[in-house]
């Protein structure tokens, strides 16, 4: 009597519920299943694991700067998130994270998807030591030019931090 195979949707649910440490065992368990859907599922999760590994490596490289300056005090990251009079105002954010923060995918906001920006917003607002937002209107951009308006928005964001930064990283 042959054993009935699990449905691909059931296997998909198993993978979705698995922790990162459980995935290698699942790959082994299902590697002999020749169905294309199962093999595609394994490949999908392996690609996600590889992407996560690369992101952790990228984040560790970024921490080189943090460790280089950590003895100086609070380190603040600054990012301009909106640009140009045609597209609206210039908005800048300034964030001080706890030392050795483990937040992944921190990057130039324009390189992130809208979904990832929303996810990171929640994490940053929950974990940050301090957050400041600065703004320059399209009229202000026309008045002083885009570059100066960007600097002005960044200065405003820094001034709104509840903790004074000692080092600024742009």
Question: Where are the predicted features?
Answer:
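Acidic (Asp/Glu) carboxylate-rich active-site/surface patches
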Residues: 1-76, 80, 86-170
